[in-house]
Amino acid sequence: MEDFVRQCFNPMIVELAEKAMKEYGEDPKIETNKFAAICTHLEVCFMYSDFHFIDERGESIIVESGDPNALLKHRFEIIEGRDRTMAWTVVNSICNTTGVEKPKFLPDLYDYKENRFIEIGVTRREVHIYYLEKANKIKSEKTHIHIFSFTGEEMATKADYTLDEESRARIKTRLFTIRQEMASRGLWDSFRQSERGEETIEERFEITGTMRRLADQSLPPNFSSLENFRAYVDGFEPNGCIEGKLSQMSKEVNARIEPFLKTTPRPLRLPDGPPCSQRSKFLLMDALKLSIEDPSHEGEGIPLYDAIKCMKTFFGWKEPNIIKPHEKGINPNYLLAWKQVLAELQDIENEEKIPKTKNMKKTSQLKWALGENMAPEKVDFEDCKDISDLKQYDSDEPEPRSLASWIQSEFNKACELTDSSWIELDEIGEDIAPIEHIASMRRNYFTAEVSHCRATEYIMKGVYINTALLNASCAAMDDFQVIPMISKCRTKEGRRKTNLYGFIIKGRSHLRNDTDVVNFVSMEFSLTDPRLEPHKWEKYCVLEIGDMLLRTAIGQVSRPMFLYVRTNGTSKIKMKWGMEMRRCLLQSLQQIESMIEAESSVKEKDMTKEFFENKSETWPIGESPKGVEEGSIGKVCRTLLAKSVFNSLYASPQLEGFSAESRKLLLIVQALRDNLEPGTFDLGGLYEAIEECLINDPWVLLNASWFNSFLTHALK
């Protein structure tokens, strides 16, 4: 390549290129591709200015050979190819005489006709990519950019190409010739691939005054001045050996960079112990609804009226009894609480005018269930700071739990379709700008895929319950208010439907801080027999409260109806997030959009329609022990939505930690799959950080087991 450069380019250009490389400490004999690139760039700059003059009338003219006495001025000032000091002197003098803004970086030319600096680019890649890099680097409206490629393409600011067609054709022909000459010598491929992106070397700006003093004070040890530190940092080779750099930086650091190979990662260790239990604020797949279609009763829309109406649709009530006690609780109190709800609802009906809200009598069973008077008495810190052995009371370490199969079933169920629609089209928000046509189309397609999804039912149920509970907590702080758990949907035929899942009774709720807790007792209908998976229902007391007739293929069958009762709690901040669960729709829509964008940029046109309507295509959904699971685009939408919804329903510090730490390992594995030869240090520490979050949370444990499946298949 070096020989080729010396043969192919004018000796003056070769000499300038060598000088420029030496100024930056680069060797033309070693970095031969760079040598060729600099020569090419210089030649293009010279050709750009050749033969272009300005005559005495100030008009731009082209003179190839002519009267040497004519009063002509060169149209372009060449800045490229001068040494830096000289180049900046020229730029400064141009700025002083013309009043043009001084550029941050050294440009290549100055155009006296258009009164602007020009940055010339010659690229072996796509012109628009290189153009954007240049524009991002110089960030100046004033400097004109003109990019040429070896394939005859060009791009210039505002499509203003400055020169006439013929002058530009000369440059393109020359570039094409260089390319052919290189190719015939087998040099082109290496030259084409060696082009790096634009590097940004900002011109140094001076730091003075207070900032300068602060900078000098905040230097690491052993550095006398900011200059001295800067020089040290600039000496870091980006691809030098990292270990040496780390040990240079600090005596304490002795990281050895280990290559990360297919055999390096081990699976995450999931905890042993009893199976994990359900911890969501309301039942998910096990919930049962009592529903009314086309509600038109008096007071329709008032939760208590709706609830009573729904209760009346069921005729199979019977004397309740406990069939799965709560290990630690006083179970008869749960039974009495349910009986009290039934009795007080009955009382309401006997009244002349049904009230809009109902506060329960403060019976001993409710006081117990809601933890009334259970909180330790608060003592002013001033009164006890002299006590010598004052300490926070010990809390037990959480008991490790193992992954149970129910959480995967819950997730699968959340991805399924129900026979009702849970959101209207406008649930995701209206268009703001007219350009949103494609966005609307995507949103409508997406809504169609997820409106019937069970995860969407969970969103609407969560929004309703959290809104109602937060309202009641503020409006009736001292009361044990009954809050019906309600949702609304539309049937296949488009008929409105109101559903009742059960009731919540809230405890005292003087919530001053975001994290202050309000206790509540939830009572939820279900057809699930708790004895099938008793570990899932550890925190519940389950009653049998009736028999329900179900229509099946073989006719009507009677099934026992259960009531799942438990004490629970939440806080203002959790209710605030619960009320905003609709955001899950937006998050998963954005994930789908980025998939469509990726497709569209490959095909260079908007692929929204094809993406949703090509039913034959399958997409990767996730990893399971069987391998990569695939499904239709609708299934992908629903799976992404379910993940987002479960992140909200099962939000916890364990999930935060696991997501943040496992992401690091995921990125390393992906780098390995992309053959980027990643290196790591203290991989053991990363594993520790991830596994510290695997304690007892069902959703985190499930994600960890998915992560292990991913590791297995990614590294095959």
Swiss-Prot record:
Family the entry assigns: Belongs to the influenza viruses PA family.
Chain ranges for the short sequence motif Nuclear localization signal 1 (NLS1) as given in the UniProt record: 124-139
Record's comment on post-translational modification: Phosphorylated on serines and threonines by host kinases, including human casein kinase II.
Binding-site residues for Mn(2+) 1, renumbered to this chain: H41, D108, E119, I120
Name of the protein in question: Polymerase acidic protein
Keyword terms of this UniProt record: Cap snatching, Endonuclease, Eukaryotic host gene expression shutoff by virus, Eukaryotic host transcription shutoff by virus, Host cytoplasm, Host gene expression shutoff by virus, Host nucleus, Host-virus interaction, Hydrolase, Inhibition of host RNA polymerase II by virus, Manganese, Metal-binding, Nuclease, Phosphoprotein
Assembly and oligomerization: Influenza RNA polymerase is composed of three subunits: PB1, PB2 and PA. Interacts (via C-terminus) with PB1 (via N-terminus).
Record field: transmembrane: none
InterPro entries noted in UniProt: INFV_PA, PA/PA-X, PA/PA-X_sf
Gene Ontology CC annotations of this record: host cell cytoplasm; host cell nucleus
Cofactor(s) needed: Mn(2+)
Chain positions of motif Nuclear localization signal 2 (NLS2): 184-247
Stated role: Plays an essential role in viral RNA transcription and replication by forming the heterotrimeric polymerase complex together with PB1 and PB2 subunits. The complex transcribes viral mRNAs by using a unique mechanism called cap-snatching. It consists in the hijacking and cleavage of host capped pre-mRNAs. These short capped RNAs are then used as primers for viral mRNAs. The PB2 subunit is responsible for the binding of the 5' cap of cellular pre-mRNAs which are subsequently cleaved after 10-13 nucleotides by the PA subunit that carries the endonuclease activity.
Annotated binding of Mn(2+) 2, by residue: E80, D108
Organism, as annotated: Influenza A virus (strain A/Turkey/Minnesota/833/1980 H4N2)
Gene3D superfamilies (alphabetical): Influenza RNA-dependent RNA polymerase subunit PA, endonuclease domain (3.40.91.90)
Places the protein is found: Host cytoplasm; Host nucleus
Cofactor note: Binds 2 manganese ions per subunit.
Main EC class the enzyme belongs to: hydrolase
Any single biological process term in GO: DNA-templated transcription
HAMAP family found in the cross-reference section: INFV_PA
Gene Ontology MF terms in the entry: endonuclease activity; metal ion binding; RNA binding
EC number assigned by the record: 3.1.-.-
Pfam family, one: Flu_PA
